[in-house]
Amino acid sequence: MNTFFKMSVMAGLLLAGQAIAADSITRADQIPQLHEEPQHATVSERVTSRFTRSHYRQFDLDQQFSAKIFDRYLNMLDYSHNVLLATDVAQFADKKTTLGDELRSGKLTVFYDLFNLAQKRRFERYQYALSVLNRPMNFTGNDTIDTDRSKAPWPKNVAELNALWDAKVKYDQLSLKLTGKKDAEIKEILTRRYNSAIRRLAQSNSEDVFQLAMNAFAHEIDPHTNYLSPRNTEQFNTEMSLSLEGIGAVLQMDEDYTVINSMVAGGPAAKSKALNVG
């Protein structure tokens, strides 16, 4: 692949990223409903077989262990217990002890159903947060916020959820206020931040869910055991070998856009002078 073609591809990717970022996600049905892909069943069966037969920590993938995997996965999806409702969690109660069977068979229905529900609820929460930004800011009350709700019960109803997010938005506003930002600027920054969070929901894919499910399983066996998807394995190997292939540019997300964070001196991107950092 010649340098010109590489640069053309990179420019196209950057423009495509900006076009996607410009799309406004305003409805829950714009968040994809993710489903298990065919290869995941085979991988799940093999990972489960390897863990149950060869892991140094001996364990039984029984109903009790399945319930622990469920609880870990649930907390990975909603660590602060401010997205899901108690009724959301309750509707999966009779499925808690079946996850071992799902992992063995490769049919990960509960994992995907719970992830999709969490995505829907998270979208609703950020939509609510955006609506809160339209209210006048008021820092005169004696408000408190619990910054660690990992052990707190899930909210019983939407009113309780709203109260938690009222506090979250006020905390975000006050944090910016203390840096000297004006009210209009605070609203603009938080609007961008919350909309970016919504767009990231729409960018989730089936592999993300599968990796999360496998890691809930792996971490319950041992906190130092991980499952890496093919994409993350490639990234891990690159970091370990300190090697970099491609046009020699490091990309990152900045708010809604993909930007060039740095370029490798002497690489195709730097030599072309067609791209700049920032």
Residue spans for each PLM region:
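Flexible, low-complexity junctional segments that flank or bridge functional domains
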Residues: N2-F4, A21-G278
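Bacterial N-terminal signal peptides
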Residues: S8-A16
